[in-house]
Swiss-Prot record:
It comes from Corynebacterium glutamicum (strain R). GO terms for molecular function: nucleoside triphosphate diphosphatase activity. It catalyses: a ribonucleoside 5'-triphosphate + H2O = a ribonucleoside 5'-phosphate + diphosphate + H(+); a 2'-deoxyribonucleoside 5'-triphosphate + H2O = a 2'-deoxyribonucleoside 5'-phosphate + diphosphate + H(+). This is Nucleoside triphosphate pyrophosphatase. Its cofactor is a divalent metal cation.
Length: 197
């Protein structure tokens, strides 16, 4: 038995690796834009939970004896939910909006084992630094934030521009270890059952 990560996110994989788990990676093929459109008007937490669930549900049938984890993160700032910026221009625009401000990173988790499905979200408050225009442009030029929810990373270059967080750091990076641990316990497992040691 193993943990299957229904994601191609290097950050989610690194979180599990640093916690002693070498997950099997099976990226989910989900039309996120269509799902987001169908969830229009839903609460932000529900949106990220449903995105995570869709990813896990696509992958789970291929791994009936394994624990499948789907995840999705988005940044809630000024009552607007933001995903990945994808472009340099969008990254710069977002950073000019979020610098010096506070926002909430919401991460949805879906953990499936057999017929059991656990869906939960975690929220962490982010206090963004007053980053200079030059630093914002250079950060965007690095390419690092283009495929990250909220256009930032906590664990790499983006860490320069985060003054503080309130909540779970692993959730900000993309997968809350406390949420996953609680889910494993509910499924009758120990976290250490999945350590590759």
């Amino acid at each position: 038995m193993q943990i299957v990560l229904a994601s191609q996110s290097p950050s989610r994989r690194k979180i599990l690796n640093s916690a002693g788990v070498e997950p099997l990676i099976h990226p989910a093929d989900v039309d996120e834009d269509a799902l987001l459109h169908s969830l229009n008007g839903s609460a932000p937490e529900e949106i990220v939970r449903q995105l995570a669930l869709a990813k896990a549900q696509v992958v789970a049938p291929s791994y009936p004896g394994d624990v499948v984890i789907g995840g999705d993160s988005m940044l809630l700032i000024d009552a607007t939910l933001q995903g990945k910026p994808h472009t340099r221009e969008a990254t710069i625009e977002r950073w000019k909006q979020q610098r010096g401000n506070k926002a909430t990173l919401i991460t949805g988790h879906a953990i499936i084992f057999g017929d059991e499905v656990i869906v939960e979200s975690s929220s962490t408050n982010i206090h963004f630094a007053e980053a200079s225009d030059v630093d914002i442009e250079r950060y965007a030029d690095s390419g690092e934030p283009l495929e990250c929810a909220g256009a930032f990373t906590l664990e790499a270059l983006g860490g320069w521009f985060i003054d503080s967080i309130e909540g779970d750091p692993s959730s900000v990076i993309g997968l809350s270890l406390p949420v996953v641990r609680r889910a494993l316990y509910r499924l009758g497992f120990n976290a250490s059952d999945f350590w590759n040691m």
